[in-house]
């Protein structure tokens, strides 16, 4: 009970502080109060580090190599502890766990090609990841191999976007550490499986990066892709809306009754945010 109360207080306090900062950064002046000033202080974190194509390619290759290394380690572990492993096909079958079977079925026969007693059980799984699997499978001709390589590549691409994102506000060392911590985090094992976690990570990282760069049409496109990966992808509309409010000082314009400018910014910039909600 006490833990729940303390957690609620911490969460709502954080929401309150974030709301104050959003309002302040959007151009709406609050009363001159020491407490409010302390809560809404905004330190500039702009980094002098500029990413290069060589760095991004290196991040992609290292991330992909890491996923391959984890895969090879898993093969060794399977041969050591599983007596039923007799070939590469048996190894691939070990990755057909949890939701992997459903994404495999969607990529293989579509949503209508599999049902249980007339119920299309795969309908709850979003389509973008199996679509990409099916495209990659045109080359490799094995959906299990195609799915794994798709996950590896998407994870590596996500690392590239996250590296670029962190480099906007932090130093190169911080960006590198962020990628390393992400890679060794226990949940990261799902980024190398036949599931769409890597797809959601990739599209979310791309969306957040373009939010910070204020490229709103790309925000809409990548945000829509995130929503096609998982339902939670639509939540990216929240940071997009916050950045739009802050960057263009919308509250300040509304306070000054500059409705024309607000409307112009909405239909030329902000309307792209709604693309991910459709």
Cite the ranges covered by each PLM segment.
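Start-transfer (signal-anchor) and selected internal transmembrane alpha helices
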Residues: 1-84, 272
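Membrane-lumen/periplasm interface segments of specific transmembrane helices
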Residues: 66-81, 95-96, 225-227, 233-278
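Short hydrophobic/aromatic helix or loop-helix immediately within or flanking a transmembrane segment
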Residues: 94-113, 118-141
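Transmembrane-helix motifs of polytopic, lipid-linked glycan transferases
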Residues: 133-135, 149-169
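Transmembrane-helix signature of polytopic, membrane-embedded enzymes
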Residues: 142-146, 162-184
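Membrane-interface transmembrane helices that cradle and orient dolichyl/undecaprenyl
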Residues: 170-172, 207-218, 248
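Membrane-interface alpha helices of multi-pass inner-membrane proteins
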Residues: 183, 187, 205-209, 217-243
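Short acidic/glycine- and proline-prone juxtamembrane loop motifs at membrane-interface regions
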Residues: 192-199
